[in-house]
Swiss-Prot record:
PANTHER family: EBNA2 BINDING PROTEIN P100, SERINE_THREONINE-PROTEIN KINASE 31
Keyword Phosphoprotein: no
Classification via PROSITE patterns: TNASE_1, TNASE_2, TNASE_3
Species of provenance: Shigella flexneri
Active site: 52, 60, 94
Name of the featured protein: Micrococcal nuclease
EC number: 3.1.31.1
Range of residues in the leader sequence: 1-23
């Protein structure tokens, strides 16, 4: 009887733990780490959730503008409480989501702002493409405007897409 009760408690504890992990729903938490220009760690109920900003692709760390993109994401989110709207979980277990952080606007007004969009609008990231097509039409419009204005990475006439850079780097090591 005691072992059955212990097993039942263990199952109940596991269910509570699984249900309390916000990996399958929208959540709020504090950004505790910036991995690169499109990936952050968010602390939620003493658990760290890795979040990949959906629909954008920032330069890699070893790539031109990689450090600047990472720094800009840090400026916008580090130690801030953010809201994440989850789109899906990728094959690496990362939450793909839209990140909203409080930004202060002229006149002192603060409002939650789409950080994914800011990164693309400021030329710190590309609109993400899947088989050559943007996954979000609005992000692609932001990218075209940033490119037109030569903002951020678009100031470099030789800016290389992260997916091409990753492929070239992988081929160089093989």
């Amino acid at each position: 009887m005691k072992s059955a009760l212990a097993a039942l408690r263990a199952v109940a504890a596991a269910v509570v733990l699984i249900v309390s992990v916000p990996a399958w729903a929208d959540f709020r938490g504090e950004v505790v780490r910036i991995l690169d220009g499109d990936t952050i760690d968010v602390l939620v109920n003493r658990q760290t959730i890795r979040v990949r900003l959906a629909d954008i692709d920032a330069p890699e760390s070893g790539q031109a503008f990689g450090s600047r993109a990472r720094q800009r994401l840090a400026d916008l989110t580090f130690r801030q409480e953010v809201q994440v709207t989850e789109k899906e979980v990728d094959r690496y277990g990362r939450t793909l989501g839209v990140v909203y952080a409080p930004l202060q606007y002229p006149g002192g007004q603060t409002q939650l702002t789409n950080i994914n969009a800011i990164m693309v609008q400021e030329g710190m990231a590309w609109a993400y493409r899947y088989y050559g097509k943007p996954t979000d039409a609005q992000m692609y419009e932001y990218e075209k405007e940033a490119r037109r204005q030569r903002l951020g990475l678009w100031s470099d006439p030789n800016a290389q897409e992260p997916w091409k850079w990753r492929r070239a780097s992988k081929n160089a090591t093989n």
